[in-house]
């Protein structure tokens, strides 16, 4: 039965205590507004995975206020579709400032 109930959440900007939070230096994870998934995701129903193309974090062309590699920005992230747990990730650009958003996953 589909109820619309939220099953899980994956933070593309890792929160305190989450894997990758330390790549957002000087607590920039707290005030960086976005590292969204605005393009098409892909799914592998046989494996039960979903693939997220995560965009450049705000502000696209200036990264001085968000030091560090900024994981999971500008990455392909593979999640378990049932649990939302990260299976693997590949960060295409570390600390992106050129708006090289992945077009799809």
What are these model-predicted stretches?
Residues 46-48:
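Short coil/turn segments that connect the beta-strands within blades of beta-propeller domains
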Residues 52-70:
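Short, conserved, GDST-rich strand-edge loop motifs in beta-rich repeat architectures
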Residues 34-39:
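Short alpha-helical segments and helix-capping/turn motifs at coil-helix boundaries
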Residues 1-31, 65-102:
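Extracytoplasmic/lumenal domain signature
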Residues 51-52, 88:
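Short beta-strand segments at enzyme active-site cores
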